[in-house]
Amino acid sequence: MIKLFNTLSKKVEVFKPIDDVVKIYCCGVTVYDLCHLGHARSYIAWDVLRRFLIYSDFKVKYVQNFTDIDDKILKRAKEESSSMKEVSEKNIIEFHKDMDSLGIMRPDSMPRATNHICNICSFITILEDKGYAYSRDGDVYYSVFKNKNYGKLSNQNLQEQNINQQGRMVNEENSKKLNPQDFALWKKAKDDEPFFDSPWGKGRPGWHIECSAMVKDELGDTIDIHLGGSDLIFPHHENEIAQSEAANGKKLANYWLHNGMVNVNGQKMSKSLKNFKTIRELIKSGISPMTLRYFVMTVNYRKPLDFTEEALRSASEAWKNINVALSFMDLTKGAFISIDKNESIEEKYKEKISFELSQKKLKFSEALGNDLNTAGAIAIIYDLAKPLKNFLNQFQRVEGFTVELNEKFFLLENFKTLEKLTEVLGLKKEVLVKESKIKEEEISSLINERLKAKMEKNYAKADEIRNLLKEKGIELIDQSKEITTWIRV
């Protein structure tokens, strides 16, 4: 049984699919820049959901869009003296690199807004015909007050809202709108903007209508699960519901799941606070992709994730232990490839081990089935990794170390189970790096020496210290001009 917290009902519900194939739609990125830690948090969570559904014998169709036309993309294109298409294409390629590095399965379909303009226009026309939309001088708006159920996802009070076409809070009313709460379905093109032809003239779609049209085209009127960050509950997902249910006359999604935001040292991650972390920067700084993935899964997807040096270091050490266990076959140099057919193991012992491991698999499924309790699932992973790591400690220290047949059977079965369950979490073996023996006091001393060198503009010496520490397996992370942290790699 799988239970999920449904933002729509505000409670945990037993998951019941509509039919044989679970239909999932996830709001994708606006492709104007590299992905950040918040994106990693979101897409890792939904990757675990998808993997767990497949592990639980569900067939899944997973769709995630690209928003490839938007004010931010147009602004970036202008800054780079390039085109909207060039900016989008470049960042879609970089998106795939980041997601692949984190072990995130590629969606079954990744529609782009610009490829669905005809569907979007048809969708808007339906809303117009039904009286939910109106046009004003080339712009088209959704009339929020026509929809009595508006606000059911976010519990927003229409009387307290004052939102503009993008759904952002403002103080002044747009004179074209019947009400300030109405939002844009189609935007009239400005002189210097790319545009698409439509029944209302040249322009481009609003953000919210893109997803409604793509959900319908890719998955139908009603889907099982709609995913996104908690920052999308309002206005984006609220507006999606308003559009889709008005046009189709059916419920858009049975389950709405939203992940929590990322904080950096207790503060919300944002560009303005200069604590913004891209996935690329984090990995380049020496944090392995699987350490990052493990770190994200230590906290339930709905809760805020606090990115701190201490939490990251703890995750790095924990993942290192699991990674050693996943490297069991490599480290034992083929000694555990199989058990010879002539070697006899008591059936009672086999049954005992099989039962114990089946109980662990059951607890693992119960944890993930309880609203994706990844921390609980990781506890089972750690339990499986422990005997493998303990054995390796002996095996590598004692030359000619031998192992009894029963223990060999236990370790092999334990390893197979570990491999299977880590795959459900998307954790994959990484190349082991010999650990540095340098002490923390020496690291701190060298960091202070490097900071002093930088203040004196002796950058050659600063680089020399960085390289020295790197040779010893220590990667420095410059948080600011005055603050440098480190991790073992």
Curated annotation (Swiss-Prot):
Cofactors, names only: Zn(2+)
Q: Where are the transmembrane segments?
A: none
Q: Which GO terms describe its cellular component?
A: cytosol
Give GO terms for biological process. Answer: cysteinyl-tRNA aminoacylation
- Key word Protein biosynthesis present: yes
Please give the InterPro entries that the UniProt record associates with this protein: Cys-tRNA-ligase, Cys-tRNA-synt_Ia_DALR, Cys-tRNA/MSH_ligase, Rossmann-like_a/b/a_fold, tRNA-synt_1_cat_dom, tRNAsynth_Ia_anticodon-bd
Which Pfam families would you find in this protein's record?
Answer: DALR_2, tRNA-synt_1e
For this chain the motif 'HIGH' region maps to: 29-39
Which controlled-vocabulary keywords does the entry list? Aminoacyl-tRNA synthetase, ATP-binding, Cytoplasm, Ligase, Metal-binding, Nucleotide-binding, Protein biosynthesis, Zinc
Localization per Swiss-Prot or TrEMBL: Cytoplasm
* EC code(s) of this entry: 6.1.1.16
Q: Which residues bind ATP?
A: 271
> Where can the motif 'KMSKS' region be found?
268-272
Q: Which CDD domains match?
A: CysRS_core (cd00672)
One GO MF annotation is: cysteine-tRNA ligase activity
On the tree of life, the source organism's domain of life is Bacteria
Catalysed reaction per UniProt?
Answer: tRNA(Cys) + L-cysteine + ATP = L-cysteinyl-tRNA(Cys) + AMP + diphosphate
Which residues does Zn(2+) bind? 27, 211, 236, 240
Cofactor annotation comment: Binds 1 zinc ion per subunit.
Share what the entry says about its subunit structure, partners included. Monomer.
UniProt similarity note? Belongs to the class-I aminoacyl-tRNA synthetase family.
Q: What is this protein called?
A: Cysteine--tRNA ligase
* Species whose genome carries this gene: Prochlorococcus marinus (strain AS9601)
The record's gene field reads: cysS
